[in-house]
Amino acid sequence: MKNWRTLIFGLMFSVSTAFAAPQQMDKIAAVVNNGVVLESDINNRLQSVKRDAQHAGQQIPDEQTLRHQILERLIIDNILLQMAKQMGITIPDQALDSTIANIAAQNHITVDQMKHRIAADGMNFDTYRDQIRKEMLIAEVRNNEVRRRVTILPQEIDALVKQISNQNTNDTELNISHILIPLPENPDQAQMEKAMTVVQKIMSELKHGVDFGKLAIAYSADPQALKGGNMGWSRLQELPTLFAEQLQLAQKGAVVGPIRSGVGFHILKVNDIRGGNPTIAVTEVHARHILLRTSPVMTDDQARTKLQQIASDIRSGKTDFADAAKEFSDDPGSALRGGDLGWTAPDIYDPAFRDALMRLNKGEISQPVHSSFGWHLIQLLDTRKVDKTDVAQKDRAYRMLFNRKFTEEAQSWMQEQRASAYVKILDGNDAQQ
């Protein structure tokens, strides 16, 4: 699970998210604050989940159970979309198109091929775009709100770095599926007994070989329930502390739990385990430059010609690079140091500057280079390999802690939003608030 890189901040889409079937008659299934969930919304999502499950070979529960899970998910989505509207959050078309292009690329197809596949599945591409936009809005609201609740102290980072070093498990990743049986903040005895009955039923069915994903779809209150509860790949340290403690010695295929937390009971399954060997040595460059900015009195041609003359004077010995930088450079930060930029990773520079720099040999001076800042004369002084183990470990520890705390806080936050909203479920003679 790469929530940090991709959307601590992370979206989980499939090509078949929205199903557009014509509806002869529509009814209100639930009232959510000042909005509604329609029967057509449930039916559309029901068809989508069934189709996705069929493509993935995933078993699903009976339709009534599946319908209940979908309704709960749509209620949460409705609440968060209302929050997005209140906050004035929008998704620009450019960002939406980029996300759809990424989804297509992840499925190894073009956007045009995606459109054909969506049409072949009986879906409307405009409806699909609208659903993706909603998913992005929901993710934006959740990320913005939950991020504020996550605090990471320096001593936490140091402690995790030490733990990683001692255990040498920093590169081991687990693919986990998760079932959450929720509980209110201060459950009474009846609520506890009801939840435990469900937990015991699930554990019994797992022992008798019932598919974990099917049970997650049927019972779990986790956001990934309709995807069979799969949380993706995570390092042990990225998982909630309660999970990590129970999973340290778990093997592939193991079922762990139930685990009691502040939001309910958790059951986990280890789908797979993998390791890796990331490189944490980086190349740094020591460079200096002379910058000329264009202006009403300095055109591009004049700047380029001026730098060519300066370079000629340096090569002939008429002046040296440092003196020329002090006299001519428009970069006040480095000019006083003779244009010296110090040691740094080349990726921090403007792409045009970086590319020209990395083509130079040690001591070589470039031709005039144009970047977003102006025109440069660049000299590569030296390169070196630097061991960034400590920096990389602290960065990794921060991301692990953030992902872990974000996951914990997101579940609590969504339950709080559900509990504080006005929700009335309309189902025949039955109404629930």
From Swiss-Prot:
Its EC number is 5.2.1.8. It is found in: Periplasm. GO terms for biological process: Gram-negative-bacterium-type cell outer membrane assembly; protein folding; protein stabilization. One of its GO terms (molecular function) is peptide binding. Residues 171-272, 282-382 form the PpiC domain. Keywords: Chaperone, Isomerase, Periplasm, Repeat, Rotamase, Signal. GO terms for cellular component: outer membrane-bounded periplasmic space. Residues 1-20 form the signal peptide. Its main location: periplasm. Pfam families: Rotamase, Rotamase_3, SurA_N. InterPro entries: OMP_Chaperone_SurA, PPIase_dom_sf, PPIase_PpiC, PPIase_PpiC_CS, PPIase_SurA, SurA_N, Trigger_fact/SurA_dom_sf. It catalyses: [protein]-peptidylproline (omega=180) = [protein]-peptidylproline (omega=0). Chaperone involved in the correct folding and assembly of outer membrane proteins. Recognizes specific patterns of aromatic residues and the orientation of their side chains, which are found more frequently in integral outer membrane proteins. May act in both early periplasmic and late outer membrane-associated steps of protein maturation. The PPIase activity resides only in the second parvulin domain. The N-terminal region and the C-terminal tail are necessary and sufficient for the chaperone activity of SurA. The PPIase activity is dispensable for SurA to function as a chaperone. The N-terminal region and the C-terminal tail are also required for porin recognition. NCBIfam families: PRK10770.1. HAMAP family: Chaperone_SurA. This is Chaperone SurA.
